[in-house]
A protein has these predicted regions:
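Glycine-rich phosphate-binding active-site loops on the catalytic face of alpha/beta enzymes
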Residues: 210, 257-274
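C-terminal helical cap(s) of enzyme catalytic domains, especially alpha/beta-barrels
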Residues: 270-293
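Catalytic cores of alpha/beta
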Residues: 193-194, 245-257
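Conserved, mostly hydrophobic/aromatic
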Residues: 47, 150, 206, 258, ...
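Short, positively charged and aromatic/hydrophobic N-terminal segments
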Residues: 4-5, 9, 13-30
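Terminal or standalone catalytic/regulatory effector modules within metabolic enzymes
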Residues: 69-87, 322-545
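Active-site beta->alpha loop and helix N-cap motifs at the rims of alpha/beta catalytic domains
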Residues: 66, 81-194, 212-216
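Hydrophobic faces of well-ordered beta-strands that scaffold small-molecule active sites
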Residues: 39-44, 75-79, 111-118, 148-149, ...
Length: 545
């Protein structure tokens, strides 16, 4: 006989007796009957971010929310956050109305809502003043968001801990995040120590954010067990992308080691470089013996059809088909699948420039596959030299851009690190937080040569508060600050996009871009004459002699 202490995570599968007893003597046979309960979250926001540029409109979100509820398997839904509000503004839509409309149905039935929060950068790609970050939590709580998933791409706790405090003050649940990657530095013990610090600072949950899907399953299992051993009451939520193909193994590993909640997606946006589908995850865990909720398949098919309708309506024109494909090549470079679309667009311009240079030198042109492999190899070269920053927004973009520019300047005979902007240098110099590893000597020497200074100053102390200036701008323009100051918040968080939105130009620009995308898609299927006839259906098409 062996003595076990019963943790609340095991649920009540062997009766009320286990519930009321703190410690009992039981056999291994009884232990095997106890099923760990696993809950699921639908990352509806991230499904779209990892697939394309835009998010569904308010009316579309309001239509799908009741269907998600009817599926009966989701304890949580990711409703908003980074890459949600900004793209709403770019489409000429009000993100505050969208967040309220999407959160409300879930709030009414007790499904928790959560948002993505970039810590120091909040909802954008560059640092945000303290007073604007504080306001964000008050606004999001008022709009119906329960949980904020706070991350720093560098895992610098200085960028996360203030947000934990402000989120708690606003009544939100702060979920602190570990950005997962695979490097000699990023061990289970390294991450566990960060989790200890974040939990001591007030984090109520921990998210393992495997944004590129390159976290090794064994490491993720070991890390989960370490955190649960040290903090048995802390909820652990796993978020893993499916791009490189490790995600299902990782889900099984973290669940077998104590994880509580798994992020999932639904068709037609699951898999590829997005997330595993709820059906597959539920089936695997159910057959492994976990206590998981059943899926209402009629509602699943309805949600699937609605999501496809949104794609066909307009969102699909901004989705890169390559994001539907998995790729083991991602394991080497570590880039997240969600940025592959923008990366391929950037690569196209460099590809043409490099091939022109090669032709001038009498060398054979490269295929796009050749260029892609060269870029992945260059990212592998650059990444350790810039200190192994986890490749998540914005550091994935910075690292990729350094590698991309290197390919061009190497071809030009100028060497590496010639075309680096202030944002790239800011990461290297420590202005965004502490880099996990060592910066390469050649970059340190280049910084000295360019009179750039490294810093270890707490990043958020470098910014002055800014709300008073934005309040004045709202007043001067005759703009209302909005319910719970939500319009003031949008201006302060996304000043450039909000001003264009208020001018009406955002909607005009978006509609022009949409028409251009539709024309481009039609143009691949129709002749010039057919395209003209389609666009002017009631007119007689004329063809020049």
């Amino acid at each position: 006989m062996q003595k076990y202490k019963i943790s609340p995570i095991f649920g009540v599968s062997i009766g009320f007796y286990l519930y009321i007893c703190n410690e009992i003597t039981i056999t291994n046979e009884i232990i095997s009957l106890m099923k760990k309960k696993i809950r699921f979250s639908l990352v509806y926001r991230d499904m779209w971010q990892s697939s394309g540029k835009f998010q569904p409109r308010k009316d579309q979100l309001a239509r799908i929310a009741p269907v998600i509820i009817d599926m009966g398997c989701f304890a949580r839904v990711e409703t908003n956050g980074g890459a949600f509000e900004q793209v709403n503004l770019l489409a000429g839509e009000n993100p505050n109305e969208a967040v309220r409309a999407f959160c409300k149905p879930f709030n009414e039935v007790g499904i928790q809502t959560h948002m993505l929060d970039r810590g120091l950068n909040a909802l954008r790609m560059y640092p945000v003043p303290d007073d604007v970050r504080q306001l964000m939590y008050k606004v999001k709580k008022a709009q119906g968001t329960d949980i904020t998933r706070i991350f720093c791409g560098l895992n610098d706790t200085r960028n996360i801990i203030p947000s934990i405090k402000w989120a708690k003050e606003a009544g939100m649940i702060p979920q602190a995040t570990l950005c997962i990657t695979t490097s000699p530095i990023h061990t289970a013990e390294y991450y566990s120590a960060i989790a200890d610090e974040l939990i001591a600072a007030g984090a109520e949950e921990i998210c393992l954010k495997d944004m590129a899907g390159i976290g090794q399953p064994a490491l993720l299992g070991k890390l989960t067990k370490l955190i649960k051993t040290n903090h048995p009451d802390i909820i652990i939520q796993y978020h893993g992308h499916s791009g490189p193909g490790l995600s299902m193994a990782s889900v099984l590993e973290v669940c077998n080691n104590g994880a509580d909640i798994i992020d999932t997606a639904i068709e037609p946006l699951s898999w590829g470089k997005v997330h595993p589908d709820i059906i597959s995850v539920q089936s695997m865990l159910k057959n492994e013996g976990f206590d998981v909720p059943e899926i209402n398949m009629n509602a699943y098919m309805q949600a699937r059809a609605l999501t496809q309708e949104f794609i066909d309506d307009w969102l699909g024109y901004f989705i890169n088909p390559a994001n539907k494909l998995m790729s083991s090549l991602l394991l080497g470079c570590g880039l997240p699948g969600g940025m592959m679309g923008s990366m391929m667009a950037d690569l196209g311009g460099i590809y043409n420039a490099i091939n022109k240079l090669r032709v001038k030198k009498g060398e054979a042109e490269l295929s796009m596959d050749d260029m892609l492999v060269k870029l992945f190899n260059e990212v592998e070269y650059v990444w350790p030299r810039v200190g192994y920053p986890p490749l998540v927004t914005p550091f994935s973009q910075y690292t990729k851009n350094i590698a991309l520019m290197n390919l061009l300047t190497i071809e030009q005979g100028k060497g590496r690190y010639v075309m680096m902007d202030d944002a790239m240098w800011g990461m290297i110099l420590g202005k965004s937080g502490k880099i996990p590893g060592e910066i390469a000597p050649e970059l340190k020497e280049l910084a000295v040569k360019q009179k750039r200074e490294f810093t270890d100053v707490d990043p958020h102390t470098l910014l002055d508060n800014a709300l008073d200036g934005f309040r004045k701008e709202m007043k001067d323009n005759g703009w209302e600050c909005g319910q719970d100051d939500e319009e003031l918040f949008e201006l302060a968080m996304h000043p450039e996009q909000y001003r264009i939105y208020k001018s009406g130009m955002a909607k005009k620009n978006f509609l022009a871009d949409l028409q251009k995308a539709k024309d481009a898609k039609l143009g691949t299927k129709l002749s010039v004459e057919e395209l003209a006839a389609f666009k002017h259906a009631k007119a007689d098409a004329l063809t020049a002699p």
